[in-house]
Amino acid sequence: ILEKYPLAASCGRVCVRFCESACRRQTVDGAVGIKMLKRFVADQAYPLAEGVFPKNLTPPANANKKRVAVIGAGPAGVTCAYHLLLNGVAVEVFEAQQTSGGMASVGIPSYRLPKDVLKAETEGVIKRLGGKVHYGKRLGQDISVDGLLARGFDSVFLAFGCSKGGMLGIQNETPTPKGYSSGIDFLLDVHKHVECGEPFSLEGEVVVVGGGNVA
């Protein structure tokens, strides 16, 4: 599993299992429970909290002398950094938020995806493989592609997400009234309050429009 991607424990908890609905094993008795199998392996044979990493995946010490900056510490950025580090590339990850995991750390509640599991598979894996993670570094504000290249990085991988809330598109819709917010923006505000201590308050009755995961 780890030869492909480093997020087995996280995916084993929150994956929506599209592959299982198309699994040909259903014609015999039932789909292969790949989601739970990955979670079991990750939880039992891959002790995240102990910092143990399979010997066959130990990276060479900056074997090719290359340096790569990865913008974004979500699943895409972490997976990119993971494979680069395993191939001996020096990697530094720059994340706008104060924690790794991308929207998974903001939009998925802890009872479904524990924060320590996500942190271990993102920041933890990168650091164990010799990479660095910088928080509070927003592209276009704190860092730039040209600036990173000028600092000696050979390449820059852009892995920032699209964490911007959408509107309903109804008549007279405007985000200006007090208390009006998209679901994504609301989750981001709550996350910043809980994790970073930024001010946030919620008063009165609340109406949630929608019935999906964000809602």
Q: Where are the model-predicted features located?
A:
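Iron-sulfur (Fe-S) cluster-binding segments and ferredoxin-like electron-carrier domains
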Residues: 18-44
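Glycine-rich FAD pyrophosphate-binding loop
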Residues: 89-105
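Flavin (primarily FAD) binding-site architecture
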Residues: 160-176, 180-181
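N-terminal Rossmann-like dinucleotide/flavin-binding domain of flavoprotein oxidoreductases
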Residues: 1-4, 18, 37, 104-154
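Rossmann-like dinucleotide/flavin-binding elements
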Residues: 70-94, 135-145, 164-166, 185-215
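Conserved beta-strand segments of alpha/beta enzyme cores
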Residues: 90, 130-132, 179
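Redox-cofactor binding/interface segments in oxidoreductases and associated redox assembly factors
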Residues: 156-159, 182, 208
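Short Fe-S-cluster ligation motifs
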Residues: 1-19, 41-71
